[in-house]
Amino acid sequence: MDPQDCACATGASCTCAGSCKCKNCKCTSCKKSCCSCCPAGCAKCAKSCVCKEPLSDKCSCCT
């Protein structure tokens, strides 16, 4: 199971899995996996992540 916080430097690559739900992920290589889902118009995710489907009314990185 992935940790809630990635332990890698800002902009660095890391080994986060595709299912990673790190809340404060700063890795350029895994920003796409910061959120497992997000509601439409989720501003917090839009700034730091490319959220994966399916969409939901709750977001793993905004709670």
Swiss-Prot record:
Keyword terms: Metal-binding, Metal-thiolate cluster
Originating organism: Podarcis siculus (Italian wall lizard)
Binding sites annotated in the UniProt record for a divalent metal cation 7: C51, C59, C61, C62
Residues that coordinate or bind a divalent metal cation 1: C6, C8, C22, C25
Region span, Alpha: 31-63
Binding-site positions, a divalent metal cation 2: C8, C14, C16, C27
Amino acids binding a divalent metal cation 3: C16, C20, C25, C30
A GO BP annotation: intracellular zinc ion homeostasis
Region (Beta): 1-30
A GO term, aspect molecular function: metal ion binding
Binding site for a divalent metal cation 4: C34, C35, C45, C49
Function: Metallothioneins have a high content of cysteine residues that bind various heavy metals.
Record note on domains: Class I metallothioneins contain 2 metal-binding domains: four divalent ions are chelated within cluster A of the alpha domain and are coordinated via cysteinyl thiolate bridges to 11 cysteine ligands. Cluster B, the corresponding region within the beta domain, can ligate three divalent ions to 9 cysteines.
Stated family: Belongs to the metallothionein superfamily. Type 1 family.
Positions annotated to bind a divalent metal cation 6: C38, C42, C45, C62
GO terms for cellular component: cytoplasm; nucleus
Pfam families: Metallothio
Gene3D superfamilies, per database record: Metallothionein Isoform II
Residue positions binding a divalent metal cation 5: C35, C37, C38, C51
Protein name: Metallothionein
